[in-house]
Amino acid sequence: MSYNAPVKDMLFVLKELAGIDTVAQLPGFEEAGYDTAQAVLDESAKFCGEVLAPLNVEGDRNPSSWKDGVVTATPGFGAAFRQFVEGGWQGLQHPTEYDGQGLPKLIATPCIEMLNASNLSFALCPLLTDGAIEALLTAGTDEQKQRYVPKLISGEWTGTMNLTEPQAGSDLAQVRSRAEPQGDGTYKVFGTKIFITWGEHDMADNIVHLVLARTPNAPEGVKGISLFIVPKFMINDDGSLGARNDVHCVSIEHKLGIKASPTAVLQYGDHGGAIGYLVGEENRGLEYMFIMMNAARFGVGMQGIGVADRAYQKAAAFAKERVQSRPVDGSAKQSVTIIHHPDVRRMLGTMRALTEGARALAYVAAAHSDIAHRHSDEATRVRHQAIYEYLVPVVKGWSTEMVNDVASLGVQVHGGMGFIEETGAAQYYRDARILAIYEGTTAIQANDLVGRKTLRDGGAVAKALIAEIGDTVAALGKLDGAAAASMKAQLEMGARALSSVVDYVLANGKQDPNAVFAGSVPYLKLAGVVLCGWQMARALLAAHANRAHDTAFYDAKIAIAQCYAEHVLVQAGALEASIVGAKGNESVLALTEDQF
């Protein structure tokens, strides 16, 4: 199936909700306003629709392959990757001083959504490279930045993130890979890393692995982990590639989805030690890796949004073609396309509402990141960075849970045909399943939301956002119509529910952590439901204000916002009850280990 990027919807969010014109007033972004965004998004849509989308099914049916340590990408991926990097897409949001485009994250984010929607397996490669670039720009030496970043931006080299080991999944305190210092300032790295996305492939000349390992006599646990650059090929003084480093791919995984993305098992040091270069200071590796991880977590949230939109497009197209049964209201005597049936409309409306809400929240988060990095006032930068950091686990956790629901509904709209691989709906369902797992499971995102993002600041950011929601509720009260009334009622209830849960977390987080963390995922889901609902409410307000300019488009925005209010926001009260009303989640903690 073809992919038609929803550029008009994206531009609506950029202008009306995320504030592209405000971002364009930041130092260095003066030329990156609405017109620039429109031009970039149009080109991205063309590339993703014409080049990447046709390869999506091919990658699923003819995935990357491994033989004797060599990984060969799906046919067509290499040529597509060359077009991608030659078009400057890898460097879209990276600094011009390293040959990037220097555009705001706010403009890059819709392009990333398109990449994910058109071909998720392909999009994973530039995602990890983006993370490597961010980590090196933040923690690398000037020499490391000059040596690696331009090549990563140009796409001549790609990047990876090496955390996981057979015994160390989410618990990085268990990392055993070791790095032994040499007399020349380098280290020899030894160990096994698993689940390394695009850890070996033939699409680029070199691969820059960022590897967590322990130096001799390092402290126990996460405080004794350091970060190292380990290139696949050594780099000569003149920048040319030298001998193969002692890192080898011993296998790739056979997966439920994202089959074209090679998930590698990498062995370091089987032949004397892989040469590595310390990033920053010893024992601060996890701190530096979190730079990469936070970039990746936001990116995975965008994967959820992209795949959700693709699943929605597929389901809507099928519903307009599939003829089954007469309408229940008797308006026709013959069978009609299934989009005429109320429950199909409910499923499609829910899919679209969830996707548009998640998209809006993610784009707004991207704008906060841009302001945090570029605003001239330090206090403003700090405030927007805090908001962005609060939103990241919600964007990652909520969007990736959401896409599992949306992709499942997409299969359901297809009926029995959705269970057949040839129709394509099943691929989105399979591809989506990993998104709530990798780069930190939903529970890890929820724990972050509770611990670092709510308890640590006394709920300051959460309460500030809830106050802003109150302003939106007040604005809704000035509008006529059923949609505004419904949204006002549900958003007001949702804000009260979120406020209640934040207060509960603050009151019980230290004295009864088991109870609070048993409700952490419902808290994250509640935050997602309410914060996305807030953005849908703002979309409704903007649609009312602009309705005369494009009645059909803005009426659809109003209707989808009402759908969100009545089918998604209504869940807020139940989520609150499952946390606050569950008496410390006694039922969750009641069974003994043997009773499970």
Feature locations, PLM:
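C-terminal amphipathic alpha-helical interaction region
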Residues: 98, 456, 472-596
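Acidic, low-complexity proline/glycine-rich segments
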Residues: 1-24, 274-283, 314, 320-321, ...
